[in-house]
């Protein structure tokens, strides 16, 4: 099984000075012996590989930002740093994000810090923020080693906001104007009524006024009084009247 490995450092000579790639993943390498303790991080089958200079890609740190790597290209990334690497964390975050994108799911990153670099905790924190998991730290041959893995799942892309947010208008905070004074509690509308009661009373009066010529009698006894009127007689409740009189219903 062939694995693609990317080595990132100041220059190729320094990379091979720090790490002998011909034995980096060899079964009998002393470095590999330390890495074999991290079975949950590294592929066990990788330890059986014998690598030469042609078996890995090299790239300087500055070239990582210039070269557009295709996502999920490499199975392993080895990053060799100097004593000033990751002083604040923000200086290393863009580089770690690029390397995270270059790794395949379950791909491994190995960060090598010189013993004079005191920022291993900052590096581990930035690796965690970038998305690496199962981070492990150990020291070997006067170098500090940080090993992590890119998870085989993608971070959630769905927004945590459900639905749409209602935009509140400033008018909602302005109290409503007081209603016009009403005369509904009074026995009759005011002379200068402005609440609408006077208009309603006049309208109701017009609708309830009916000319006596309008209604017709089916029995012809309406003028005699309620005792002679039908149940649905329009004149019920009115006094008797002479036949032919004009009666106004209100």
From Swiss-Prot:
Q: Which InterPro entries match?
A: Anamorsin, CIAPIN1, SAM-dependent_MTases_sf
Which annotated residues bind [4Fe-4S] cluster? 219, 222, 230, 233
- Does tRNA-binding show up as a keyword for this record? no
User: Where in or outside the cell?
Assistant: Cytoplasm; Mitochondrion intermembrane space
Superkingdom of origin: Eukaryota
User: Which GO molecular-function terms appear in the entry?
Assistant: 2 iron, 2 sulfur cluster binding; 4 iron, 4 sulfur cluster binding; electron transfer activity; metal ion binding
Q: Which UniProt keywords apply?
A: 2Fe-2S, 4Fe-4S, Cytoplasm, Iron, Iron-sulfur, Metal-binding, Mitochondrion
Report the record's Gene Ontology biological process terms.
iron-sulfur cluster assembly
Q: Where is this region: Linker?
A: 154-180
Q: Which family does it belong to?
A: Belongs to the anamorsin family.
Q: What is the protein named?
A: Anamorsin homolog
What taxonomic classification does the UniProt entry list for its organism?
Eukaryota, Sar, Alveolata, Apicomplexa, Aconoidasida
